[in-house]
Amino acid sequence: MLQEAIKKIVSKENLEEREAYAVMNEIMSGNATPSLIGGILIGLRLKGESVEEITGFAKAMRDNAIKLELASDYVIDTCGTGGDGGKTFNISTAVAIIASAAGVKVAKHGNRAVSSKSGSADVLMELGFDIEMVPEKTKRLIEEKGMGFLFAPKYHVAMKNVAGIRKELGTRTVFNVLGPLTNPAFVKGQVLGVYDKELTHPLAEVLLRLGTEKAMVVHGFDGLDEITTTSPTFVSEVKEGKVIDYVIDPEDYGIPYAKLEDLEGKDAKENAQIILNILKGEKGPKRDIVVLNAAAALYIGKVVEDLKEGIKVANYLIDTGLALDKLTEILEYQRRLN
């Protein structure tokens, strides 16, 4: 199967969705040789991955993952592909906490650091989250308190079959975008940051095919995989069964432009402190970018009608201490579960 696929890819032909599914299934099974897997990954990188290919791969990875079956019918995720080289603090992690304080159910899917000094798993550990929590307890945490963390290696066990190859290749592959597309809770809403403008529309199309109801796939003009505050941001939104493209400018929402260095984080310990300071009400560019992205999460989470209202609600949740209280409440409940 893989040899046939390589022939096709090398001839610059796209795989059909079902072929891509079969290829990824074979890779996940552990039966594929490293050289064939490497050939597929590099071939795809050179050809460029199609929407059908990414969809097929994502479906196979979802089917090979340990699933988290939630009773709630609408759950969201806030995450990025990483790899944007921006050295920012963990914005989407702060956003997840604020969204859950507004009553949005958040299944935060993530891993340790890839391109930064601190991934969502690293910073959540610093904040007191048990990232190795068994799925059954994580499920209760999301259902009862509105937010839980799904540590990717715990759910995507078959990924160990490609970990060594990805490290050896040392270049971006399709797996860099598959992480955020394969949340084991099968979330219906998503704010997804990507490292390349060319990915926003295709990945929104993929999310649509995967059954996503509402999503914003975003990429800042400055290169960040967030809705940025140093420049406008490209957005491809999944809305009512279609993908629409537009641009968000922070100044239109009363948020002043920041400098990239204003948004930088350091290691997990410092990033956790940045998040706590924001939740305690500290003002400035770091809070601004969190509020703007939280507004998007509240919009995707169906608690506000638009970003303007989302910004008001996010600011309210911070200023009243409700967001910080929510974090305390989640950690307290986690302690009881453990």
UniProtKB/Swiss-Prot annotation:
Amino acids binding anthranilate 2: R166
Cofactor(s) it depends on: Mg(2+)
Top enzyme class: transferase
Family as reported in the entry's similarity comment: Belongs to the anthranilate phosphoribosyltransferase family.
Co-factor binding details: Binds 2 magnesium ions per monomer.
InterPro entries: Anthranilate_Pribosyl_Tfrase, Glycosyl_Trfase_fam3, Glycosyl_Trfase_fam3_N_dom, Glycosyl_Trfase_fam3_N_dom_sf, Nuc_phospho_transferase
Binding-site list for Mg(2+) 1: S92, E226
SUPFAM superfamilies, sorted: Nucleoside phosphorylase/phosphoribosyltransferase catalytic domain (SSF52418), Nucleoside phosphorylase/phosphoribosyltransferase N-terminal domain (SSF47648)
Sequence positions that bind 5-phospho-alpha-D-ribose 1-diphosphate: 80, 83-84, 88, 90-93, 108-116, 120
Keywords: Amino-acid biosynthesis, Aromatic amino acid biosynthesis, Glycosyltransferase, Magnesium, Metal-binding, Transferase, Tryptophan biosynthesis
Record: residues binding Mg(2+) 2: D225, E226
Known pathway: Amino-acid biosynthesis; L-tryptophan biosynthesis; L-tryptophan from chorismate: step 2/5
EC number: 2.4.2.18
Cited function: Catalyzes the transfer of the phosphoribosyl group of 5-phosphorylribose-1-pyrophosphate (PRPP) to anthranilate to yield N-(5'-phosphoribosyl)-anthranilate (PRA).
Native source organism of the sequence: Thermoanaerobacter pseudethanolicus (strain ATCC 33223 / 39E) (Clostridium thermohydrosulfuricum)
GO biological process, one term: L-tryptophan biosynthetic process
GO molecular function, one term: magnesium ion binding
Keyword Nucleotide-binding tagged: no
One GO CC term on file: cytosol
Protein name: Anthranilate phosphoribosyltransferase
